[in-house]
């Protein structure tokens, strides 16, 4: 006799909500004002990777030495990737355990890398992977993961009064022309992302 079991995850009440803003200098900045710094695994291994890659390029393709060196380069890349995954799994688990709902922007990380020429920085950041890990960890626990539209002007809105102003890429502080509120631009953006997620959740 065969039995089918359906795993139903009970939805948790949404009380504690966190907004995450992508940061070029860090992994992310959150709506609580916390900054998550990211170990730069790729940059830490970049010189060694380049050195081993140069050795490989000088070898005769198909030779035993070439195959050995190719495997060595592949293992180095795999090691860096595994370091990144381990860190992001731990970080996403910590967030998923602490919050009922997490809100992020639905930004295209690959397009951003090409458009702003962030190549290596973005390769080392892992924010896109973190979002994926958060999504399934939260949803497996009956919690919410929400993406706000990529065109949502999170950096332009004053989280204090709702006024809107354009802000340059080099401006690190948001100063509202209407109410005078002053705040770190990334924290202000993370709070706006959080609030927009709450609005979307409530419908």
Describe the residue ranges of each PLM region:
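Positively charged, helix-rich recognition surfaces that bind polyanionic ligands
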Residues: 1-203
């Amino acid at each position: 006799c065969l039995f089918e079991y359906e795993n139903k995850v009970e939805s948790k009440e949404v009380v504690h909500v966190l907004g995450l803003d992508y940061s070029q200098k860090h992994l992310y900045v959150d709506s609580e004002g916390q900054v998550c710094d990211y170990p730069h695994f790729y940059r830490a291994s970049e010189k060694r990777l380049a050195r081993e890659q140069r050795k490989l390029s000088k070898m005769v393709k198909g030779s035993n030495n070439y195959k050995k060196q190719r495997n060595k380069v592949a293992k180095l890349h795999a090691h860096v990737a595994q370091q990144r995954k381990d860190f992001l799994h731990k970080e996403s688990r910590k967030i998923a355990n602490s919050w009922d709902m997490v809100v992020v922007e639905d930004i295209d990380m690959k397009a951003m890398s090409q458009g702003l020429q962030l190549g290596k920085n973005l390769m080392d950041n892992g924010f896109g992977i973190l979002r994926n890990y958060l999504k399934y960890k939260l949803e497996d626990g009956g919690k919410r993961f929400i993406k706000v539209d990529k065109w949502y002007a999170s950096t332009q809105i004053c989280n204090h009064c709702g006024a809107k102003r354009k802000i340059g890429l080099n401006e690190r502080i948001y100063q509202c022309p209407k109410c005078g509120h002053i705040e770190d631009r990334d924290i202000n953006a993370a709070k706006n992302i959080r609030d927009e997620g709450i609005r979307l959740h409530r419908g």
